[in-house]
Amino acid sequence: MPKKTLYKPGQNEAFELSRSKIDLFLQCSKCFYLDRSENHRIARPGGPMSYIPTAIDLLLKKEFDVHRQNETVHPYCEDHSLSLIPFKHDDIEAWQNNRKGIRYHHEDTNLILYGAIDDCWRDNNNVLHVVDYKSTTASYDPKTLEIKQVSLDEKGAPHKYWYKKQVEIYQWLLSKNNFDVSNTAYFVFASALYKNVEAFNKKLDFKIDIISYDGDNSWMENTIVNIKSTLESNNVPEGNKNCIHCKYRGVN
């Protein structure tokens, strides 16, 4: 098992890359190179830990684990006319572990790609669907205060582009592990309700929405090859001219 977290050009040892590092490369190849290169070791500053979303993810996993064990459909799925069952597999806990995840050794580049899924559901034909949990606050119409429908529209919400890339990476990893994987992934949105609520009273109520997304991971292969080429270079790449981190460092 590879132990190095920084890459040395020309190394023979397989090198691990998490899903988040693939995201980093897509966002800015310069930031990625500075972060992973043994010659630089310059990481982007980290943000604060999101403890409440993490807690919601944990509780959702506990709920779906009950239905995984019983091989039953969760009521959330029934509410959305989905007859999908949480996938039961000996490695599911490892796949959901951020330090382990589902892995694939890309032999042509000697890179080990991995990522921790939130969940995986199966249909009646044992075709797998990647599932990702997202927690947020409900969006309301400013005039009527009616709750707006959750969507994956990126307009005004560019982070949702990365939601999509995230599940596409997981779809690719599962397929490379010889599972039959659907292009259709699902996002389970837990939206906290706060308008028309009299007081906190030490609790929040949530609206659950399940949104489907048809992924396309055909970009993965070329991206992996480009990642390896970047790691092997002794030159810092140009990166993304719109990268705010590079602008802050004054290196663009």
Summary of predicted features, one role per range:
Residues 1, 16-17, 173-252:
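Metal-dependent nuclease catalytic regions and adjoining charged, substrate-binding loops involved
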Residues 1-127:
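Metal-dependent nuclease catalytic cores that hydrolyze phosphodiester bonds in DNA/RNA
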Residues 28, 113-153, 165, 169-170:
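Conserved catalytic cores of phosphodiester-cleaving nucleases, focusing on short active-site segments
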Residues 33, 121, 129-133, 182-189:
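A structural signal for short, well-ordered beta-strand segments and their strand-loop junctions
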Residues 33-34, 41-43, 138-142, 193-197:
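Short catalytic/ligand-binding loop motif for oxyanion handling, primarily in non-cytosolic enzymes
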Residues 35-36, 63-66, 119, 129, ...:
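Residue-level signal for well-ordered alpha-helical scaffold segments within enzymatic catalytic domains
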Residues 49-52, 141-161, 206-213:
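Short histidine-centered catalytic/ligand-binding loop motif
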Residues 153-185:
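Metal-dependent nuclease catalytic cores in nucleic-acid-processing enzymes
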